[in-house]
Each structure stands twice: as structure tokens, then as C-alpha cells.
A protein has these predicted regions:
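The feature represents the first ordered module of a protein
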Residues: 1-62
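Short helix/strand-capping connector loops at secondary-structure junctions
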Residues: 59-72
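Short, compact, well-ordered microdomains
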Residues: 69-96
Length: 96
């Protein structure tokens, strides 16, 4: 699998929250049918709460909200970012 880094951003917000977004363009395969591999992380360093979105094989697209794991239906990069921001606001009370 040839992966081309499409986007990477990591930041510390208010000396408390870590946000990291990594998106790779990959060949369309059975493992990555959308041609994208991603990892989105938002973590509260003070309380240990976290929101994670990724699509590693064999699980495919899914979301971690603290210790809970949920399936996720990937539609597009824009929708992925929109959903990530909504999850952060809903579960952490932080607007990016």
C-alpha cells in the first residue's frame, strides 16, 4: 500500500487539549475501499477524556468516545471533519 500524506496537523489548545488529524491518500483496496486512511484524535490531558476516529483494518471506520467504540459510516473528508467537530463539542464541550 502506497500512502501519500494528504494532511497532518497537531496542536495543543489552552494548554489542556491535544488535537491531531492525519489523513493519507491510499490505493483503493479491500482494506481501504474509500482510498483514504485517517486518524483523528482529541484528548483532554487533564481529565483523560478522548475522541478518536480512525479506519484501520480490520475494523474499518469507527469512533472511540472514551472507552466506548461505535461504528462510523465514512462519506467524505469534509463530513469526517464535520462529524469530528460535532463529537468534540457534544462530548467535550469544546468548539474548534
Amino acid at each position: 500500500m502506497n500512502a501519500v500524506l494528504k494532511y497532518h496537523h497537531k496542536a495543543l489548545i489552552r494548554d489542556r487539549y491535544v488535537v491531531e488529524v492525519v489523513i493519507y491518500e491510499v490505493s483503493v483496496t479491500q482494506k481501504y475501499p474509500d482510498g483514504i486512511k485517517y486518524r483523528l484524535i482529541f484528548m483532554d490531558q487533564k481529565e483523560g477524556k478522548k475522541i478518536l476516529m480512525d479506519n484501520h483494518h480490520p475494523k474499518g471506520p469507527h469512533v472511540h468516545i472514551n472507552e466506548h467504540e461505535l461504528e462510523y459510516s465514512y462519506v467524505s473528508e469534509d463530513k469526517l471533519m464535520e462529524d469530528f467537530n460535532k463529537l468534540i463539542l457534544t462530548h467535550m464541550g469544546v468548539r474548534l
